[in-house]
Amino acid sequence: VTVMDLPQQLAMLKQNIAGKPGCDRIDTYPGNLLDPGTGIPGGFDVVWMSQFLDCFSEEQVVSILQRVSATLKPGASVFIMETLWDRQKYDTASFDLAQTSVYFTAMANGNSKMFYSEDLFGMIRKSGLGVVEIIDGLGFGHSLIKCGK
């Protein structure tokens, strides 16, 4: 397993896993995904992105996904875990996610929003990837999107 994140996040990861079973199987790769010049390591069978694309603008999401797509070996998959407000089982959950978007936009970085699924799927397609499968209802309202070239 290789984890890519900001150096300070990787330092916390290393502290948290030190001495735990399997810690020797976790590698780290520091980088700022918001910098279009940041390379992304390749050669993996699976790339997992969990609950962070919703923090960025469409342009930033497409840039990240394009760079991931460029590193994929044949047959590799990209899995994206997000809370998609229009794919919730209950209307109240959709409403709550929409209000979370308002909170994050106003209080965080001005970009954060919970995705409308077709908007995210459009960004995925724009990056050169395609949606292969969608699994809804994971955990508390999460969707897992399997992507490939």
For the regions a protein language model found, what residue spans apply to each?
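Alpha-helical subdomain
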Residues: 1-149
